[in-house]
Amino acid sequence: MSPLPLVESDDNAIPLTLITDVKLDDWRNAQADAVKAWLSATGFSGKAGEICLMPRDDGTVASVMVGLGDGEDKWAAGRLARSLPEGTYRLDQIVGVQDKDKNQTATWVALAWCLGAYRFDRYKTEPSSLAAVLVWPDEVDRGYVEGAAEAAILTRDLINTPAEDMGPDALAAAAEALATEHGAVVKLTIGDDLLSENYPAIHAVGRAADVAPRLIDMVWGEADAPKVTLVGKGVCFDSGGLDIKPSSGMRWMKKDMGGAAHVLG
């Protein structure tokens, strides 16, 4: 898994101002004439995901304005990691969001930055570099950001892996690795054992494959705790029987195990 695009600190980090569209005029009117003129010239309106680079006199980036729209779009910062010039950035101001909600907004910015930076680079000789990184905002719930980002990245990696490298055995191995990391227990029911355990449908779908079908059963948590069961479809490549699907229907069948990937994530 690639490292998250979040760093501890950088004295030279470029400040980010996040602002809602309804507060933009008030904020702009309080700025210097040069700032007002630049915002007017670029047409920055504060809509969700909009970016405006604020220049220094020497042409380098002094700061960045980021639109939040009405403030309800959790993913407004999702394109920053891939749209901003190379460098380190820090969250400086959140304008137009109530104080009680600013910590939540900062948390969503950090998570959106992580998800926006994602690239599937398993088959690249040189993994994608992180051009724009964010200093951890003080207000964020780090545990939530790291957990949610790593979960989403795992899910994406499993789905993006082509079927030749993501068969039933590979998906089961991913589940076992996750179980080892988090203290869960995995039970695999493989091949003809599916019939004796009363899973005939799973057996029927995968019995002709070179790699035997299997049921992955992962259990985590205290035995006496309330039970929540998540079920995800894990067909690693659905050919529609004996390859009866047209090419347009076959193209994306590597993601037919996306339900299982989401459960693991």
Set out the residue ranges of the language-model regions.
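N-terminal hydrophobic/helix-forming segments and targeting peptides
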Residues: 1-235
